[in-house]
Amino acid sequence: MTQDKEVKVVAPDVAPDQEVEINKSVKDAKHQTNDDSLLQHKKKGKKGKKSKPIVTPEHIAKVRAEREVMRKAKRDAMLAQGVDPDCPPELHFIRRPFLSLHEAEPVTGFRFKLMTYNCLAQALIRRKLFPDSGDALKWYRRSKVLLNEFKYYNSDVICLQEIDHIQFQSFWKDEFSKLGYDGQYYRNATKNHGVAIMWRRELFHQVDKMLIDYDKESSESISTRTTTNNVGLVLALKFSEKVLSNLGKKSSKKCGILIGTTHLFWHPFGTYERTRQCYIVLKKMKEFMHRVNVLQNENDGDLSHWFPFFCGDFNSQPFDTPYLSMTSKPVHYRNRAKTVIGCSTSYKFSKVRDGEEGADDEEGGNIEKYGKDQPESPVPEKFHANEEQSELVDKMAQLHNSLDMRAISLYSVGYKNVHPENAGLDNDRGEPEISNWANTWRGLLDYLFYVKKWDPQSNCQEVETLGDFEKENKVKCRGFLRMPPGNEMTKHGQPHVGEYASDHLSMVCDLELQL
């Protein structure tokens, strides 16, 4: 390198002001080296002759030290931006912070992180649906980014949706095992993807399991609208001896957690069926809570031995009937919610869905053709239901009100306390604005629920305060993974190189359970 050539070091993902600072230190080092060389030349050289500068061991050591300072400055600048300097740029992802609560309060219970994440099944990827994603869709890259994300957020229990069966067997099972997790996987036999629950084996061990096949589950007088092939998975995870010993306990009345996950019907006109599926979620959780009590707690009738959670992709927004039927009880459909579910009852699903493999693949497009007897929009401004359709809607509300169970969204009760700018932007439940950012659709579809008994004589239509929730359920929310509002997202959809590895964003709650 000639002495008059300027040295410039460009660090990927480093802010401009940080880059200037780094290059300034390099330039200063270069000038100092030039001055030393010039001095050596004046002392040793003869008039009319040029001599080479003498390179001493001290000079070499000095240059090496300056280079090390430069490398450290570059590395520190990247770390400050949440960028792993040891990771190739194409495997980077946007690292979101945890927003903490109760920081001044000591931890006295069992603390763990609970994640839900729709990872976008490789089997469902079609280039036309992800026109801006480029190489981000390639599994050999995407798998590494997803794995880096799991390592970074370091959750203790992970609920996953859209996990390819092939990838789970050949990749995820081994990779999670290396990280200290055990897991369970379930799918419908006609689908290439399913759901999974992973847990840190040093904290829990599985003592029971329940599988949910929505098409086979009865919902009183309400029949399935169509074949969906959707499934759910619920586990009983008992606290390990290590958990109890770390809390100074030999035993505890609290045994562990019940954790479920699912991926509900995706179809735009599937609101009625999704609402039925949400009834199945609560009904099956009630059954499982009682079964675990019989098998693990000698049928003592005390359901408080276990903390029940249910997480996943519900393909429903906070102002739609599937979500509201679980969280706002007694159920009463009105305004937009009533219009949308009423409209969905008028939609006629193709019989091709009944039994044909792949007919219902998520993101696969509608196999039904619009016609004169089909509604044009799943969210019309107005819908005039006929008598039969009105009766179907009323029956659904009655069905949910007959079940003494409800769900509480953890982000709904707590997120406004850490990120009020993105709590309830487009809803009155305090939920963040988005968890899905695809090319053609953006919104909130994913939730982490706490499930509990509901007294039909009580009114639980409004969102409770964080304090009331924590006191009543012995669950403390110590933090939430930050969810970006829509105005912070790019114009293009996800996944995208250097941003996110799925069209969904992971959601995580940092929880403390009082044992």
Curated annotation (Swiss-Prot):
Domain of life per record: Eukaryota
Q: What is its EC number?
A: 3.1.-.-
CC per GO annotation: cytoplasm; nucleus
The answer to whether the entry has keyword Cytoplasm is yes
**Region Disordered: start-end pairs:** 1-54, 353-381
Mark out the compositionally biased spans (Basic residues): 40-52
Q: Where in the cell is it found?
A: Cytoplasm; Nucleus
UniProt keyword list: Cytoplasm, Exonuclease, Hydrolase, Nuclease, Nucleus, RNA-binding
Where does the record locate the signal sequence feature?
Answer: none
- Write out the GO MF terms: poly(A)-specific ribonuclease activity; RNA binding; RNA endonuclease activity
| Record GO biological process | rRNA processing
Q: What Pfam families does this protein map onto?
A: Exo_endo_phos
Q: Where is the composition biased (Basic and acidic residues)?
A: 21-34, 369-381
- InterPro entries documented for this protein: CCR4/nocturin_mRNA_transcr, Endo/exonu/phosph_ase_sf, Endo/exonuclease/phosphatase
Q: What does this protein do?
A: Involved in pre-rRNA processing. Required for the final stage of 3'-end maturation of 5.8S rRNA at site E.
Q: Other comments?
A: Present with 3570 molecules/cell in log phase SD medium.
Q: Which family does it belong to?
A: Belongs to the CCR4/nocturin family.
Q: Which PANTHER family match?
A: CARBON CATABOLITE REPRESSOR PROTEIN 4, NOCTURNIN
Q: Would you tell me the protein name for this molecule?
A: RNA exonuclease NGL2
